[in-house]
Regions:
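Small/aliphatic-rich secondary-structure junction motif
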Residues: 473-527, 548-552, 600, 607-610, ...
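Extracellular loop-to-transmembrane helix junctions
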Residues: 21-121, 156, 229, 236
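Membrane-interface loop-to-helix entry segments
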Residues: 117-168, 223-227, 363-377, 431-445
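A generic transmembrane alpha-helix motif of multi-pass inner-membrane proteins
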Residues: 360, 364-365, 369-370, 402-459
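Glycine-rich, Arg-bearing micro-motifs that act as flexible, cationic patches
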Residues: 578-599, 614-615
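Helix-loop-helix junctions that connect adjacent transmembrane segments
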Residues: 113, 145-218, 223-290
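C-terminal membrane-solvent junction of multi-pass transporters and transport-like membrane proteins
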Residues: 328-338, 375-427
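Membrane-helix boundary/coupling elements in multi-pass transport proteins
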Residues: 12-23, 61, 81-101, 194-212, ...
């Protein structure tokens, strides 16, 4: 279970990473008004964060704005919101990988700092992380906390150093005196929604709500911490940046800041934080500081890319469970138990989005999806205040607004006005972004309609994949149960596993071992043994129903214990159910197996003590004799 610190670290790891690229993207358009843009987008972030805090505390389940839309409206709007979220995740993956390449190139090989090196680096990174997530990774909470603290303290140190070394109010005042010409009103208005890319990751805490400890307290508390940390950096660092890299105007009237100029033209748009450090007089610490910032940026951005892939994995599975997309996309890998098809498909889309190498376009596309999902979150909270006024709210968004007898959240009202206005600005002033974003939404809605019709479902009702309730409510319950089988089917073991499984859909995974003697190649055909192992899986599915999944595993004699431990770790099992071994002539195949499992267990081990039938004992003797062969 996750507490305040873990939730804060996970969220700030995502939100804090975006400053490494958002600063350059915004400065390219807003020029000297970049700090003002971050203050305005910070207000939107505050409104949105309070909405997420109230709604997530009400419904402490994974899902974020998609869950809020389901509770407030219906399944169609839940899908619409989830599909916008998916766009956010895809773009987060692409843009984080893209800028990781540029920071890496800043202190290593220049090839990665320019096209096509940045694209090659980004695509390779996405492909690697997609494969890693197919293999299955766990969120390392302690690592997240350490990275978040290091990141925040480093950014804070940069702000403090900048205040003493480069901060110049006179320069900043001059930077802000060109509104209407530098930046133009159009660029300034576009920069505001683009600035929301600085707040990627607000969904993180909401999606981890199901893992939170005392969610009524920890979720609002962690969101408040994120807001404080974000404002401490985002409301100060842009002033330092514009002092170090001020706006300069040429004889033709055009104005620029190196903060928003591409690297090819001598600027720092692709690595703005590194640019700030390079333009500080740090003396003997200069070189070390530049390397430190670049390495930290690459580390944080790689972690953000991985967080995006993890988000795709979770969202794909959630949408599949709620019948919002074809089952094939949420299909779990037979060995690694991850939605591998969804991970590979949406990671491939992130690679496609990266190919043009247009960072500003990626940022605006992110803003397109984010403004939609944030708007739906605000609208959902407003509607829930009307339709569900009596639902307990451990946290309430500040302020009160009485309208026709209803107590509405004023910050959510301001938030939806701001996000919808920003969405309108993006769509009206950038046709290519509007076309790409609308195409994504239309494709998603078409897939949704076709899929639901083929399933015989309407578009608005919630139809979740059947997950039966626990068999008994007084037994210990586990999220997943591993049942390894080597000596024939045992219905008593399966019955015990059924009682322990809390999630009945794929909540029980059966591994049926086929033991291959040392004298034969591991891939040698063993039709009888394979048929018997397959029969075990079929009997398990008959007894356990759709809750059961499984696969065959070829092993050598004596390897069962190790494979059980590895399988339990890979699938993140919370319990292993084994039959109690019977001693035969002083030894037993499963005697060694059980000793290995108990010695190296990654989770709780439950032993079923029902004696095996005589046929099983006879088969064990035969296996032992075969295993003894050299």
């Amino acid at each position: 279970m996750l507490g305040d610190n873990a939730l804060f670290a996970s969220a700030y790891g995502n939100v804090g990473s975006s400053i490494y690229y958002a600063l350059g993207l915004v400065a390219a358009l807003a020029l000297g008004l970049t700090p003002v843009v971050f203050i305005l987008t910070g207000a939107l972030f505050y409104f949105t964060a309070t909405t997420y805090a109230e709604a997530t505390a009400m419904y402490p389940e994974a899902g974020g704005s998609s869950l809020f839309a389901r509770q407030a409206f219906n399944e169609f709007w839940s899908f619409f919101t989830a599909w916008a979220q998916m766009l956010n995740y895809v773009i987060t993956i692409a843009i984080s990988a893209f800028f990781a390449a540029h920071y890496a190139g800043g202190v290593s090989w220049d090839y990665f700092s320019t096209s096509p090196g940045d694209i090659v680096f980004g695509v390779a990174l996405i492909a690697l992380l997609a494969l890693v997530n197919v293999r299955g990774v766990k969120d390392a909470v302690s690592v997240n906390i350490v990275l978040a603290v290091i990141d925040f303290m480093s950014q804070l140190a940069l702000v403090l150093a900048g205040l003493f070394l480069v901060f110049n109010p006179e320069v900043l005042s001059q930077n802000m005196s060109f509104l209407g010409t530098a930046p133009t009103w159009k660029d300034f208005l576009i920069a505001i929604p683009l600035g929301t890319v600085a707040y990627t990751g607000i969904e993180t805490i909401s999606n981890m709500a199901g893992e939170a400890k005392e969610e009524a307290k920890t979720i609002p508390a962690s969101i408040k911490r994120v807001m404080i940390a974000v404002f401490a950096i985002y409301f100060t660092l842009p002033w330092i940046a514009l002092s170090a890299l001020p706006v300069r105007c040429g004889g033709d009237g055009s104005c620029t800041t190196l903060l928003g100029v591409p690297k090819e033209d001598g600027g720092y748009a692709s690595d703005p934080i590194l640019g700030i450090v390079e333009n500080m007089a740090l003396g003997p610490l200069q070189g070390a500081a530049e390397v430190y910032v670049a390495v930290l940026a690459v580390t944080i951005l790689v972690a953000a890319t991985n967080a995006g892939v993890l988000g795709v994995s979770r969202l794909t599975y959630s949408m599949g469970i709620h019948r919002q997309m074809p089952d094939s996309l949420r299909r779990l890998h037979p060995h690694f138990r991850t939605p591998y098809i969804g991970i590979l498909v949406f990671s491939a889309l992130a690679c496609v989005a990266l190919l043009p190498g247009q960072a500003e376009f990626l940022g605006l596309i992110y803003a397109f999806g984010a403004m939609l999902s944030f708007s739906m979150a605000h609208l959902a909270l407003i509607r829930l205040r009307v339709t569900e006024p009596d639902v307990p709210r451990p946290y309430r968004s500040p302020g009160r607004l009485r309208v026709r007898g209803h107590d509405l959240p004023p910050l959510a009202v301001l938030g939806v006005l701001g996000t919808l206005l920003s969405f309108g600005v993006i769509s009206a002033l950038n046709v290519s972004v509007a076309a790409a974003g609308s195409g994504w939404l239309l494709l998603g809605m078409l897939l949704y309609v076709v899929y639901r019709r083929r399933q015989g479902l309407d578009l608005v009702s919630t139809h979740k994949v059947a997950i039966p309730e626990p068999v008994v409510d007084h037994e210990a319950e586990y999220d997943s149960v591993l049942v390894p089988v080597s000596d024939g089917y045992d219905e008593h073991v399966m019955a015990t596993a059924t009682k322990l499984a809390a999630r009945k859909r794929r909540g029980i995974h059966v591994v049926s071992f086929v033991t291959v003697p040392h004298a034969l190649p591991i891939s040698a055909p063993l039709p009888d043994e394979e048929a018997a192992a397959q029969s075990v899986l079929e009997q398990a599915r008959i007894q356990g129903g759709r809750r059961v999944s499984g696969h065959l595993e070829r092993i050598r004699p004596g390897q069962a214990g190790r494979r059980i431990v590895e399988e339990a770790s890979d699938m993140r099992a919370a319990a292993i159910v084994l039959a109690l071994p019977q001693r035969i002539d002083g030894a037993s195949l499963f005697g060694k197996t059980l000793e290995t499992v108990l010695a190296e267990r990654p989770c709780r081990v439950v032993i079923e003590s029902t004696p095996p039938p005589a046929a099983t004992v006879k088969r064990r003797r035969a296996i032992e004799r075969a295993g003894a062969a050299p």
